[in-house]
């Protein structure tokens, strides 16, 4: 089976889904390819990742119709931040701002669980008529020519498109197959991230 689209997007995470949402109503036929099963896209499990979003990110998500799909009691404002350096007395302090992007603001940004962002993005994109989402199969091979990109899936299906977007994580196998390099640095540091409960109010 062969399917032709204007744009092929490998990876239906927040980046791939948001890209597709941006092109709603463009008339372009978009095919999203995601290795995870459909159930994972519909109800992503909590994966421990908390994403800090800026005011601009919030504006983009509002414009795309994603923001209002996130439970209000799971959007946590970041009001103040400090960066400590071991035993040093020096610290970076980011106080609560009074303005952000020319508007009154009462926080630095927002902390939202990654699975909530993924779920909201999928809910928006799944309703778009110009987007087809293929799930449960990965990419076996990628080919490009002057005219198009071709993706061969693990299930044998062949897809083609005028543009190919690799949104399959920072370790993108699609990028590697195309010979596109990346610049990564290992700083030999360890970071401890966890959720904490405390008796005092955040207010």
Set out the residue ranges of the language-model regions.
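N-terminal Rossmann-like FAD-binding beta1-loop-alpha1 element of flavoenzymes
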Residues: 5-32
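Glycine-rich, N-terminal phosphate-binding loop of Rossmann-like dinucleotide-binding domains
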Residues: 12, 168-169, 196
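Conserved Rossmann-like nucleotide-cofactor binding loop
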Residues: 15, 38, 171
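Rossmann-fold NAD(P)-dependent oxidoreductase module
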Residues: 22, 120, 124, 195
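Glycine-rich FAD pyrophosphate-binding loop
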Residues: 24-49
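N-terminal FAD cofactor-binding segment of flavoenzymes
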Residues: 45-86
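Conserved N-terminal helical subregion
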Residues: 73-177, 184-190
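Flavin-dependent oxidoreductases
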Residues: 177-178, 190-203
């Amino acid at each position: 089976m062969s399917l032709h689209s204007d744009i092929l997007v490998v990876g239906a995470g927040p980046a791939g889904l948001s890209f597709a949402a941006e092109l709603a109503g463009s008339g372009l036929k978009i095919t999203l390819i995601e290795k995870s099963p459909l159930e994972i896209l519909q109800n992503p499990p909590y994966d421990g990742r908390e994403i800090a979003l800026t005011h601009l990110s919030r504006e983009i998500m509002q414009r795309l119709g994603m923001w209002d799909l996130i439970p209000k009691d799971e959007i946590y404002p970041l009001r103040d931040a400090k960066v400590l350096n071991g035993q040093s007395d020096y610290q970076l302090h980011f106080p609560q701002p009074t303005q952000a992007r020319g508007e009154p603001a009462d926080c630095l940004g927002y902390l939202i669980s990654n699975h909530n962002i993924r779920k909201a993005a999928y809910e928006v994109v799944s309703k778009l008529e110009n987007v087809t989402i293929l799930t449960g199969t990965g990419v076996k091979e990628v080919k490009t020519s002057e005219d198009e990109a071709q993706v061969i899936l693990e299930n044998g299906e062949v897809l083609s498109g005028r543009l190919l977007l690799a949104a399959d994580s920072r370790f993108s196998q699609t990028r590697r197959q195309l010979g596109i390099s990346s610049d990564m640095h290992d700083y030999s540091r360890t970071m401890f991230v966890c959720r904490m409960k405390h008796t005092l109010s955040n207010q």
